[in-house]
Swiss-Prot record:
The protein's role, per its UniProt record: Involved in base excision repair of DNA damaged by oxidation or by mutagenic agents. Acts as a DNA glycosylase that recognizes and removes damaged bases. Has a preference for oxidized purines, such as 7,8-dihydro-8-oxoguanine (8-oxoG). Has AP (apurinic/apyrimidinic) lyase activity and introduces nicks in the DNA strand. Cleaves the DNA backbone by beta-delta elimination to generate a single-strand break at the site of the removed base with both 3'- and 5'-phosphates.
Annotated protein name in UniProt: Formamidopyrimidine-DNA glycosylase
Keyword Zinc appears in the UniProt entry: yes
Cofactor binding remark: Binds 1 zinc ion per subunit.
PANTHER family reported in the protein's UniProt record: FORMAMIDOPYRIMIDINE-DNA GLYCOSYLASE
SUPFAM superfamilies linked: Glucocorticoid receptor-like (DNA-binding domain), N-terminal domain of MutM-like DNA repair proteins, S13-like H2TH domain
Zinc fingers (FPG-type), renumbered ranges: 250-284
Cited Pfam families: Fapy_DNA_glyco (PF01149), H2TH (PF06831), zf-FPG_IleRS (PF06827)
Subunit composition and interactions: Monomer.
Entries under HAMAP family matching the protein: Fapy_DNA_glycosyl
GO biological process, one term: base-excision repair
Catalytic activity from the UniProt record: Hydrolysis of DNA containing ring-opened 7-methylguanine residues, releasing 2,6-diamino-4-hydroxy-5-(N-methyl)formamidopyrimidine; 2'-deoxyribonucleotide-(2'-deoxyribose 5'-phosphate)-2'-deoxyribonucleotide-DNA = a 3'-end 2'-deoxyribonucleotide-(2,3-dehydro-2,3-deoxyribose 5'-phosphate)-DNA + a 5'-end 5'-phospho-2'-deoxyribonucleoside-DNA + H(+)
């Protein structure tokens, strides 16, 4: 599943290609693409045409387009199109005569003739059109800030983590504590901070927890600079290009490879129906 850096790459692409343009029409081609929408696809199609995209925003793994009334020029958006990429969703900028993808689920046409496609092979992603509350779609108002958010309070997040008697990796994956972190970046930030994934959060100092959050920010900033992490053709930016941070991973998917710090072989253990990758020497459980 795309995590924070991958979604941010897509958001930036949509910002470049959509902001300032008016949506001429929308077409929802698969019911699952609007499965959370009251009224389904027709509700999106009927209410989005004629609106102008004023901004492309993101929180964690969710992104949305802020929409305003084009004729009136209203500058305070109260409506947004939420996009969740799911496991394999792609938002692609296409010319009108581009060959149709068999996995095209929804699309919008812009006033400059470009089309924006939502391509989703596994159909876990979706669009949702709804109200913004304090600038955030109602549907994701419960999602916490992420480590790249300028408003993120690492001290407050660290206190929240320390108050819980649970494995630190489990908490990092909880989108209501800190958002945008999935299995890849949890493993990477834990490796950088030299913390075992099963270490209980309440047994870590506040200083160590803040170091961990800073490690997450550092790792994700580097990943963003490299276009995110792509292991297959399902994750691409709006132009269809893959990221290359997979070449810089230190822990995730590095089973049997020497640790970049000490040379001990990275191991993988099952965790929450997925795998945790870590160095048994650098990341000892305390």
């Amino acid at each position: 599943m795309p995590e924070l850096p991958e979604v941010e790459v897509v958001r930036r692409g949509l910002e470049d290609h959509m902001v300032g343009h008016t949506i001429v029409s929308a077409t929802v081609l698969h019911p699952r693409a609007a499965r959370n929408q009251l009224g389904g696809g027709p509700e999106i199609e009927a209410n989005i045409a004629g609106l102008r995209v004023s901004a492309a925003k993101r929180r964690g793994k969710f992104l949305w387009l802020e929409l305003i009334d084009a004729p009136s020029g209203e500058t305070r958006p109260d409506l947004g199109l939420l996009v969740h990429l799911g496991m394999s969703g792609q938002m692609l900028i296409k010319e009108p005569d581009a060959p149709i993808s068999p996995h095209l689920r929804a699309k919008v046409e812009l006033d400059n003739g470009d089309e924006v496609w939502f391509v989703d092979q596994r159909t876990f992603g979706y669009w949702w059109l709804g109200d913004l509350v304090d600038g955030v779609p109602e549907r994701v108002s419960h999602i916490a800030t992420d480590v790249l958010d300028e408003s993120a309070d690492f001290s407050a997040i660290a206190r929240n983590l320390k108050s819980r008697k649970s494995e630190i990796k489990r908490l990092l994956l909880n989108q209501e504590i800190v958002s945008g972190i999935g299995n890849i970046y949890a493993d990477e930030m834990l490796w950088q901070a030299k913390i075992h994934p099963l270490q209980r959060a309440d047994r870590l100092s506040l200083a160590r927890l803040e170091e961990l959050l800073q490690a997450g920010k550092d790792v994700m900033t580097k990943a963003l600079a490299q276009g995110g992490t792509s292991f297959d053709a399902l994750y691409v930016n709006v132009n269809g290009n893959s990221g290359y941070f997979a070449l810089s991973l230190n822990a995730y998917a590095q089973t049997g490879e020497p640790c970049g710090r000490c040379g001990t072989l990275i191991i993988r253990e099952s965790f929450m129906n997925r795998g945790s990758h870590y160095c048994p020497n650098c990341q000892k459980r305390r």
